[in-house]
Amino acid sequence: MTTPTLIVTPPSPPAPSYSANRVPQPSLMDKIKKIAAIASLILIGTIGFLALLGHLVGFLIAPQITIVLLALFIISLAGNALYLQKTANLHLYQDLQREVGSLKEINFMLSVLQKEFLHLSKEFATTSKDLSAVSQDFYSCLQGFRDNYKGFESLLDEYKNSTEEMRKLFSQEIIADLKGSVASLREEIRFLTPLAEEVRRLAHNQQSLTVVIEELKTIRDSLRDEIGQLSQLSKTLTSQIALQRKESSDLCSQIRETLSSPRKSASPSTKSS
């Protein structure tokens, strides 16, 4: 039988360190740069439109205003480029931290799965050993059933040879019960042969192995009980046959004595006459 195994609960995943997964908070300078970049984005549209107008009529009307607008446009572009340069590294760092955390979780899950696989492989090894032992026991029991079946076949042949005597000595009900018992024994032995193949196919099904083994034990016990009953019945039949033969021989001897006694009584009477 399989030995009870303990289910090992997987350990809790490692808690992420605060310093590794903590996203750095933006400083005051970063906030100022962000506000300046947003303001510059608002100004870009206005200054761009005004720059187009300034290029058209700036040198004719007010070249100083055109120079100031161009300077503001260049400053806004420089601020946007600086903001994008600063924030690109921050977003990349955040994405890398998320990927590292997911990789740690995946690594932990893989280690837990490896431990479970090793535990299941050990359980399967012990189950296969127990199954081989049960199969050997079952085949030995089946061989014993076949030997007993051969003995019952020889006994049945003896009963067939003495059919006439059995009909005279015993009733038809006892013979019918004996035939029914032998037929049921044959059917159960035929049923055991596909069960042996079923046991081989069920080697990979661990959950149903215990149920199949219990059923086989029940069938084996029932067959043993029936074999014991049949052996007891055969003993009783043998004793009854011997008793009936003895009674018949006694009856025959009595009949012979009664038949011979009138002859003896008749012989003295003839002499006296």
From Swiss-Prot:
Effect of residue 180 to D: In strain: Da/MT-566
Cellular compartments annotated: Secreted; Host vacuole, Host pathogen-containing vacuole, Host pathogen-containing vacuole membrane
Consequence when changing residue 90 to P: In strain: C/UW-1
Mutation effect (residue 222 to N): In strain: B9227
Residue ranges crossing the lipid bilayer per the database entry: 41-61, 64-84
Keyword Secreted in annotation: yes
GO cellular component: extracellular region; host cell membrane; pathogen-containing vacuole membrane
Disordered: annotated span: 1-20, 254-273
Keywords: Coiled coil, Host membrane, Membrane, Secreted, Transmembrane, Transmembrane helix, Virulence
Highest taxon in the source lineage: Bacteria
Coiled coil: 172-233
Record-stated family: Belongs to the IncA family.
Free-text note regarding domains: IncA proteins share the same general organization: a short N-terminal domain, a large bilobed hydrophobic domain, and a C-terminal cytoplasmic domain.
Function: Chlamydia replicate within an intracellular vacuole, termed an inclusion. IncA is probably involved in the homotypic fusion of inclusions.
Name of the protein described by the UniProt record: Inclusion membrane protein A
Species the sequence originates in: Chlamydia trachomatis serovar D (strain ATCC VR-885 / DSM 19411 / UW-3/Cx)
